[in-house]
From Swiss-Prot:
GO terms for cellular component: cytosol. Pfam families: IMS, IMS_C, IMS_HHH_1. The active site is at E106. SUPFAM superfamilies: DNA/RNA polymerases, Lesion bypass DNA polymerase (Y-family), little finger domain. Poorly processive, error-prone DNA polymerase involved in untargeted mutagenesis. Copies undamaged DNA at stalled replication forks, which arise in vivo from mismatched or misaligned primer ends. These misaligned primers can be extended by PolIV. Exhibits no 3'-5' exonuclease (proofreading) activity. May be involved in translesional synthesis, in conjunction with the beta clamp from PolIII. Its cofactor is Mg(2+). GO terms for molecular function: damaged DNA binding; DNA-directed DNA polymerase activity; magnesium ion binding. Its EC number is 2.7.7.7. This is DNA polymerase IV. It comes from Ectopseudomonas mendocina (strain ymp) (Pseudomonas mendocina). It catalyses: DNA(n) + a 2'-deoxyribonucleoside 5'-triphosphate = DNA(n+1) + diphosphate.
């Protein structure tokens, strides 16, 4: 099988970086982009000065200000961010047409057949980083690896403004030392369960056969086994278009009843609406839906055509979904189906 060359590009605190670029007086101080604290706003992103205080994306603005009283929160300018992402996308297309956007500030590139720099993925990543910095005056981090799973981990390895390369002959050594918490799809709850089983690294995970992992984790067990062996055959999807947008959260302690679930709704909806604003204009929000996973891992999803996307509609959906199991809940999700105005035959031009 032909060896692939995948690059994962991730802009460094993208929204905040653009705000600091356009207004240098904002630099060198704790800065966040997000909603107002007195309106239950949520942090979309923040700079590294703010992160030093523990401020993080998806955190409520009110909590962020408690952690960092000097934090300046500015309103997002999504049209500006979309414009910059289009320019970055244009730089990508100088090297390959195989581009899978993940968000306004993140994308996979398959440069396996790119003739640039004699086919060197490392040199291509270096040039992309140089051009973004020179032309747009922001920084991006890049990861280069034989597959998407490793390229994404690599891009985070030397953030901010870094480049990390995992060559094919380095994959095995790199993966065996990798903490399982770094694996895609492993959140806090799954990581805690793995730790209880004595699994802290991918080397530990390799001691388990595929069947045993499936017994413990269901279908995700097979995915864990493959990732622990550095295997990820997912292709870079050029025509990847969203069918829906959702936000979900797994809780450290099960939510005992419907009322405790309803209390979690406003924060979930705030985060979902923030993500909706980041979509490009070729999508139109459609049917709202909720997802409920009960403590015994059974789950249900409920959607309603024609319903609005306000709090009351989601409360009604959640109440109906919860009644299907009427058990303690470990995960809640809210989302909306998306209508693709552009059509599936058209190539993506913006980061979605």
């Amino acid at each position: 099988m032909k060896q692939r060359k995948i690059i994962h590009i991730d802009c460094d605190c993208f929204y905040a970086a653009i705000e600091m670029r356009d207004d240098p007086s904002l630099a060198n101080r704790p800065l966040a982009v997000g909603g107002s604290a007195d309106r239950r706003g949520v942090i979309a992103t923040c700079n590294y000065e703010a992160r030093a205080y523990g401020v993080r994306s998806a955190m409520s603005s009110r909590h962020a200000l408690k952690l960092c009283p000097d934090l300046l929160i500015v309103k997002p300018r999504f049209e500006v961010y979309r414009s910059v992402s289009r320019e970055i996308h244009g730089i990508f297309r100088q090297f390959t047409d195989l581009i899978e956007p993940l968000s306004l500030d993140e994308a996979y590139l398959d440069v396996s057949d790119s003739p640039h720099f004699a086919g060197s993925a490392t040199r291509i990543a270096q040039e992309i980083r140089r051009r973004v910095a020179q032309e747009l005056h922001i920084t991006v981090s890049a990861g280069v690896a034989p597959n998407k799973f490793l390229a994404k981990i690599a891009s985070d390895w030397r953030k901010p403004n870094g480049l990390f390369v995992i060559t094919p002959d380095q994959v095995d050594e790199f993966v065996t030392a990798l903490p399982v918490s770094k694996l895609h799809g492993v959140g806090k709850v799954t990581a805690d369960k793995l730790t209880r089983l004595g699994i802290r690294t991918c080397l530990d995970l390799r001691d388990w056969n595929k069947l045993a992992l499936v017994r413990e984790f269901g279908s995700f067990g097979e995915r864990l086994w493959r990732l622990a062996h550095g295997i990820d055959e997912r292709e870079v999807k050029v025509d990847s278009r969203r069918q829906s947008l959702s936000v979900e959260h797994t809780y450290d302690q099960d939510l005992p009843d419907l009322q405790s679930c309803l209390e979690k709704l406003p924060a979930l909806l705030e985060e979902m609406n923030g993500r909706l604003q980041r979509l490009d204009a070729s999508y139109r929000p459609d049917k709202p839906f909720v997802k409920v996973k009960f403590h015994d891992f059974t789950q249900t999803t409920l959607e309603q055509a024609g319903a609005s996307r306000d709090l009351d509609s989601y409360r009604q959906l959640l109440a109906s979904a919860h009644a299907r199991g009427d058990k303690p809940v470990r995960l809640l999700g809210v989302g909306v189906r998306l209508h693709d105005l552009r059509g599936r035959q058209e190539q993506l031009e913006l980061f979605a």
